[in-house]
């Protein structure tokens, strides 16, 4: 099992980039080489790589790798569309292509805006600038994820202490927001990881410094939603939770209310990621997030969005202005996965001993379908937005003030 979504060998002038093909998980681990912007575009568009932070990183790295090829005169001679005297113009056009791969995730848009400021007709200068930016975006994302994890864990435990809650509790999450969606550790799943680290210390009897102990509450189980129709919860989040040995139970998207009402341990919070957060706090995230927020609101469960400030959109006032990507209808009509033996529940292997992929139809081919990739959760349903800069809470009038997130 591998949780390394992006492998970047950062040697100036000799960089290499590989990404984990997440369409093959959880039964097969295979890495794809990224050499050009076209490679980056295809891997993002096809969802071989997904998660707003990871999409941005792969976009940046694919641009870096294409510029690294342009340092080679032999490569330039094979490219009819590349005239190095027009490098800045051509690269901007290439970035337009990259941007079209996933329009809802703002991290990619923000990163491309930064890249446009770094490119010029000087290929050497452009490459060096892109190399430094690529290193920085990966390092900052990784560090920010740990910070968000700690911020979120401390905040929830402090809230539970205010409620005088003690004992075991569970949390909900949707889609995949962990190492596979970022440079490592994760956003919403990073908070869950940090919560469970505290639980393990309490169970083992390890003493915590008084200044960090905020509650006797213990998160003892995670309930990830399967996240139809692409099943990021069942394929990817379940994979990460098993890897980290975090107690968890996978549930169907339609069973949330029944789970909450019958669970033997109280469900105290839901942690979700974000692909775009606008100025009033409205949040675009994986389809199904909005309905999860409605369930949490009904049952009085805290609902938190976890995202780095690179996910904030300073140009959009409210969520109704967000462009929501619609995926191809056949991604809904068909289910793709690893072929399982009908008599023995193990993967069927081909001649090279790798699992066989299969696609199964689940609805009439001529049935019209609606397949939005995201929905918009209104800020009124969100109790807090957890970032690397801290936790944004609402004022007494129920409004967020996110100005510092945009600085």
From Swiss-Prot:
Enzyme class, broadest EC rank: isomerase
Entry EC no(s): 5.3.1.23
Site (Transition state stabilizer): 175
Pfam families, per the entry: IF-2B
Main subcellular location: cytoplasm
Localisation per UniProt entry: Cytoplasm; Nucleus
The entry's keywords: Amino-acid biosynthesis, Cytoplasm, Isomerase, Methionine biosynthesis, Nucleus
GO annotation, biological process: L-methionine salvage from methylthioadenosine
Coiled-coil intervals: none
GO cellular component, one term: nucleus
Record-level Gene Ontology MF annotations: S-methyl-5-thioribose-1-phosphate isomerase activity
Family classification: Belongs to the eIF-2B alpha/beta/delta subunits family. MtnA subfamily.
Role summary: Catalyzes the interconversion of methylthioribose-1-phosphate (MTR-1-P) into methylthioribulose-1-phosphate (MTRu-1-P).
Protein name: Methylthioribose-1-phosphate isomerase
Species this protein is from: Kluyveromyces lactis (strain ATCC 8585 / CBS 2359 / DSM 70799 / NBRC 1267 / NRRL Y-1140 / WM37)
């Amino acid at each position: 099992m591998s949780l390394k979504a992006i492998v970047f060998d950062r040697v100036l002038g000799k960089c290499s980039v590989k990404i984990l093909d997440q369409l093959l998980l959880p039964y097969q681990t295979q890495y794809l080489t990224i050499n050009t912007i076209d490679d980056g575009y295809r891997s993002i568009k096809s969802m071989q790589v997904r998660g707003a932070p990871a999409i941005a990183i792969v976009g940046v790295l694919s641009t870096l790798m294409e510029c690294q090829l342009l340092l080679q005169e032999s490569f330039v001679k094979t490219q009819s569309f590349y005239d190095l005297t027009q490098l800045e113009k051509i690269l901007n056009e290439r970035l337009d292509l990259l941007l079209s791969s996933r329009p809802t995730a703002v991290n990619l848009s923000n990163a491309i805006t930064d890249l446009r400021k770094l490119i010029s007709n000087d290929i050497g200068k452009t490459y060096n600038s892109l190399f430094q930016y690529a290193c920085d975006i990966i390092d900052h994302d990784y560090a920010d994820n740990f910070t968000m994890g700690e911020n979120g864990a401390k905040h929830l435990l402090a809230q539970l202490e205010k409620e005088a809650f003690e004992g075991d509790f569970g949390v909900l999450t949707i889609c995949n927001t962990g190492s596979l969606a970022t440079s490592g550790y994760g956003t919403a799943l990073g908070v869950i990881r940090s919560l469970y680290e505290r639980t393990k210390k309490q169970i083992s009897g390890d003493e915590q410094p008084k200044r960090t102990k905020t509650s006797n509450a213990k998160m003892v189980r995670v309930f990830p939603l399967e996240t139809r129709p692409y099943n990021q919860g069942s394929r990817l989040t379940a994979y990460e939770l098993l890897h980290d040995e975090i107690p968890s139970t996978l549930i169907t998207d339609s069973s949330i209310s029944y789970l909450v009402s019958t669970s033997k341990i109280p469900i105290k919070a839901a942690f979700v990621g974000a692909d775009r957060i606008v100025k009033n706090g409205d949040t675009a995230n994986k389809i199904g997030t909005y309905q999860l927020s409605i369930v949490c609101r009904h049952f009085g469960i805290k609902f938190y969005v976890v995202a780095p400030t690179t996910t904030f959109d300073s140009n959009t006032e409210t969520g109704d202005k967000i462009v929501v990507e619609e995926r191809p209808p056949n991604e809904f009509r068909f289910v793709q996965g690893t072929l399982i033996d009908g008599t023995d529940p193990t993967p069927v292997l081909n001649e090279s001993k790798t699992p066989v992929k299969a696609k199964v139809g689940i609805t009439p081919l001529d049935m019209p379908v609606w397949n939005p990739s995201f929905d918009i959760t209104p800020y009124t349903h969100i109790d807090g937005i957890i970032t690397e800069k801290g936790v944004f809470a609402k004022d007494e009038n129920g409004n967020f003030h996110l100005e510092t997130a945009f600085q």
